[in-house]
């Protein structure tokens, strides 16, 4: 794969993408050699910066179409002709009761349950597991045992699965929001609001029942309501105004104090490690939002001769030729790659 796109080596990931021309390459060795190299880099890197996109959650089993959609949204599919969870998020439902019934299901089955497959847990085991109290994110933080590797995660995913797997929230930057948060339509309120309690009530009101593990399931008779009671329509707790999801769709997205703090921590982590042996590990990042993770990772790798860029993605694993010698591109399912890694020596 090749192209005449542009690329610059900017340490902060912002850089002028027109600064130099380059070719894109996808071949960096055999699959086995690439996995072996990645395994070594994970073991030897001073720091690992994980950039995660939608492909990681897909690998974890959070698919937006197919069996999961047909199981939990069959009634919406039949009535409205909706074919997947993603497009359903944009559907013009007839009233707020139906709109929020949809969203409560969408949130619950993508945010408040554990991932069907263990890829997040496998990544956690590679980088975390507390061993020593010699590394903290901020000086003002109370000293805590450090992870196996000094790491940070930046992700465009909004499903909270890194935290559910045990990752330290002080090492996470969710750039595009969180399914677990509402924001007010009142633009003057720059706050977000936890929605877990509301989601549980809304799910129950539609007829979902909890199984022996406390997870909501479709009842045996299959009867569900596609509306929530009017009194359950979520409102802003501060001024009673309507709420929307805290998901980046336009300039109304609220970057609250938690978001700003995470952004600051991420920038500080990059600064402190800019000349060290850093592994930029990109997982499941596609071409929809390359300026958030992919391009900055390329730029920072080019700027630091001690850095290595690794990409695992199904059908979209490539890198600029300028960093070819320090690039590891693996085309395939992320879970499968991490399952193979312990077997390769």
List each language-model region with its residue ranges:
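Conserved catalytic alpha/beta core of Sir2/sirtuin-type deacylases, generalized to analogous enzyme cores
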Residues: 1-345
